[in-house]
Amino acid sequence: MNLEALPKYYSPKSPKLSDDAPATGTGCLTITDVMAAQGMVQSKAPLGLALFLAKVGVQDPQFAIEGLLNYAMALDNPTLNKLSEEIRLQIIPYLVSFAFADYSRSAASKARCEHCSGTGFYNVLREVVKHYRRGESVIKEEWVKELCQHCHGKGEASTACRGCKGKGIVLDEKRTRFHGVPVYKICGRCNGNRFSRLPTTLARRHVQKLVPDLTDYQWYKGYADVIGKLVTKCWQEEAYAEAQLRKVTR
């Protein structure tokens, strides 16, 4: 049994709760078996299971973020160690939240639109015609609200890759013309990941507000390195939790 099969047991749509295809045998897992297996996995891999359940929206992410925060505080990073305790306690929780947000992204997830800051509109300076009672009309420049063209007023946008639309593959036009049949290749924009990752420049802007004299070396060797380690830790813990679940349910 894989971790991806767990969320359906939290919102069943039919009385047939099984991880296997319908069969006459008794080897299929019931919801009681799955919940018992989850309890055993939680005792052996609590962080990995919490990360996955928080990623799919089943569980509150607070416990998972606290586990990542403890891991980040234990990291021996020279750049972070040079900071004062006050600044360090402000930066590390933000890096942890940023890494968790990057880990939680998928082709089906949505994120706040960065172009309108989640409002669905943005203010632009336009020429507006003003009409008066005397029949005169005057053109003035005013700030007006316009619908955001990226999210179409929703305030959130899909994180799926714009090149492949979340498929991971795109049509190879050159080889398609050569062979006369559709030929596909891995999307060069997302490298087959099907979604775009969070740009670390967003985290750098926040860090630079607290550390004004931030250099490129300090960013890449310190803060960006911590983000990379945190994201890697998330995937390692999830893989370990899945291995434990397979071991329990085999």
UniProtKB/Swiss-Prot annotation:
* Swiss-Prot/TrEMBL keywords: DNA-binding, Transcription, Transcription antitermination, Transcription regulation
> Which HAMAP family does the entry mention?
Antitermination_lambda
GO MF terms listed in the record are: DNA binding
Organism, scientific name: Escherichia coli (strain K12)
Query: What's one GO BP annotation on this UniProt entry?
Result: transcription antitermination
What Pfam families does the entry give? Antiterm
Q: Which domain of life is it from?
A: Bacteria
Q: InterPro entries recorded for this chain?
A: Antitermination_sf, Antitermntn, HSP_DnaJ_Cys-rich_dom_sf
List the residue ranges forming a coiled coil, or say none: none
Free-text function comment from the UniProt entry = Positively regulate expression of some phage genes. Bacterial host RNA polymerase modified by antitermination proteins transcribes through termination sites that otherwise prevent expression of the regulated genes.
Protein name as annotated:
Prophage antitermination protein Q homolog QuuQ
Q: Which family does it belong to?
A: Belongs to the phage antitermination Q type 2 family.
